[in-house]
């Protein structure tokens, strides 16, 4: 086949999903459909890169235009995601060769990998081995992570909606606690995601507008946890405000690097498995002060809450999907679309790009000047950064009082290769 003929594209979702990753999928698919001179069919990996390895591919052309359009307002990963990190090329060349074999069998010339830090690394490695094996493949990393820790982009699609959920939940829960504090609950602890970066925890700070407003304490991974200082601040808050609302990142740790809630296990990417910092902190307070408490873990709720998604986040998620295809057909390879902030007030942004070599495996943490001097709150500079990202509402359609989310048919592509044994 002539290499000037249109080739197929493969889209895959990776890692933890978000409220808007499907909007990115819609951006990729709808834009690819408009570039018939370059792209023939769009395929998707069922459960991400695992589907690609197992030649378990979905024919997206079998989905209706209404379903693809409906992805814009549907949370989670419509095509299935996976926590599966490819090892280095030298460590497990067979996996990379298998992917190229699958690409060759299905004439896949474009690969769009929608994920976070590790996914950008995988896309970069694939672009390299494609060259080594003499198979031309355009690899574009498409940004997605609620943790907001990818470098070279002002923000990451998925973060704005989580930030909005956490800010709203913090404000609403604080009103509840304030109502009950006289005779009942004095402390409320909300545990949010964020293994090493405190962006999501910082978003809780948007719930308050003036001094004394909740949350009264935010615990960031970037600030070493000091038990005595923390307990003193809790007591001060209860004595002056009548109650205390705390937002704690799952990655909060002591000065020696020990996580407050280290479960002693790792996930498929090799990251420490965390969970349970909320009750750890709450019990610490009860033992020290005897206050009645409630704690909650936002967990999957924070990243699945499409009903309260940020309009800006939805728009940016679609935009990076669209830009990924436009970069690919323009001849770019091993790059990632980025969000570029032009101004904060009024908020203006555009789409740029960065090379995967720059982005891969780099983690962006919350800057120190975004955290107050005492380490328990956010600064005005942080607020200026965060506020535009949660702006606007993009409600899904409702039927019978519930969001009308779509589900794909997921028609599989006929396999051409023998099974792959991992």
Q: Where are these predicted regions, by residue range?
A:
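Gly-rich Lys/Arg/Thr-decorated short loops/hinges at beta-loop-alpha junctions or inter-strand turns
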Residues: 5-12, 71-85, 144-154, 184-185, ...
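Short, ordered loop/turn segments at secondary-structure junctions
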Residues: 14-16, 44-50, 83-84, 116-117, ...
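Glycine-rich oxoanion-binding loops at beta->alpha junctions
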Residues: 1-2, 55-109, 118-119, 171
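N-terminal phosphate-binding or glycine-rich loops at protein starts, especially the Walker A/P-loop
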Residues: 2-56
